[in-house]
Regions:
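Signature of the catalytic double-stranded beta-helix
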Residues: 76-142
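N-terminal auxiliary "cap/dimerization" subdomain that precedes the catalytic jelly-roll/cupin core
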Residues: 1-94
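Catalytic core of Fe(II)/2-oxoglutarate
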Residues: 184-251
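Catalytic core of non-heme Fe(II) oxygenases with the double-stranded beta-helix
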Residues: 133-202
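Conserved hydrophobic/aromatic beta-strand scaffold that supports enzyme active sites
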Residues: 27, 145, 170-172, 206-208, ...
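Structured loops at beta-to-helix junctions and adjacent beta-edge loops in soluble globular domains
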Residues: 31, 77, 144-146, 174, ...
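Short, solvent-exposed loop/turn segments at secondary-structure junctions
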Residues: 33-34, 148, 214
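A short, structural micro-pattern
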Residues: 68, 137, 165, 212, ...
Length: 251
């Protein structure tokens, strides 16, 4: 029996900022991403091949082999995107109880991807969305391309469970999914039991999250064939600097 996937509640491009402010999250389809970023769908899809060369995540505390990823940091100032010196990814335990509290060094994004006009345009677009929420300012951006696969039978997109990221805006692009079941996205209001669940299936569709107002998670994936996978691009934007171990208050 084939399970029915719940479609996401798509928002029109013209309503994006209003919906995001009203409910704390919004989902737009790939056509909207293309229109809002001024990047053709063909140019977006050309980036997909970079997900075929992601190194294994060596930091998984559950012993899994199901996650591959890279990491890079950027600044967005007045719509201009510049790459920041390569740095460790760090989160406090209060936001990531499983992998927080340690400096995780991942291989950088391929320069052949980050040097494209399409990449800069997508990141600049996200900067505009963040400024629409919090006001125009410099944005400190971290980008994480992920591949979750079913090497271990089950792959966990969010092994830390439902969480926030400690930033202002979280963007989750669904790059593709192949030969899997599961991978349902769940978004909950941070101060009430209200929530929604849906499954992103369209390549380059986008979930945007006001991190102060909602928590989110994605359910595990299981194979429908010999090996399945789910590719995403997670981009976080934060005002007032990157999340940094040195900047945390001493208890």
């Amino acid at each position: 029996m084939t399970s029915t996937l719940l479609a996401p509640p798509l928002t029109a491009p013209s309503d994006l900022q209003a919906v995001l402010k009203k409910q704390g999250f919004a989902v737009v389809g790939s056509d909207a991403v293309s229109a809002l970023s001024s990047v053709s769908h063909a140019d977006l899809v050309r980036l997909n091949s970079f997900w075929n060369n992601l190194p294994p995540d060596q930091y998984l505390k559950d012993g899994g082999r199901y996650r591959r990823r890279r990491h890079a940091s950027f600044l967005v100032q007045g719509g201009v995107v510049s790459q920041y010196a390569h740095r460790a990814h760090w989160q406090p335990l209060s936001y990531n109880a499983l992998h927080g509290g340690m400096r995780r060094w991942f291989e950088p994004l391929d320069s052949a991807m980050t040097s494209t006009v399409a990449w800069s345009a997508v990141i600049s677009f996200l900067g505009r969305v963040a400024s629409g929420l919090r006001g125009e300012q410099t944005w400190f951006v971290e980008a994480h391309p992920f591949r979750i696969d079913t090497t271990d039978g089950i792959g966990r997109p969010t092994p830390e469970g439902a969480h926030r990221d400690g930033v202002d805006l979280v963007a989750v692009f669904l790059i593709g999914r192949q030969g899997i079941k599961g991978g349902e996205t769940r978004v909950f209001d941070v101060s009430s039991p209200l929530g929604q669940r849906f499954t992103l299936t369209e390549p380059w569709s986008l979930l945007l999250l006001d991190d102060a107002r909602v928590i989110h998670e994605t359910t595990p994936i299981q194979p429908q064939s010999e090996l399945g996978w789910r590719d995403t691009l997670v981009v976080t934007l934060r005002a007032s600097g990157f999340l940094d171990e040195a900047a945390q208050p001493v208890a």
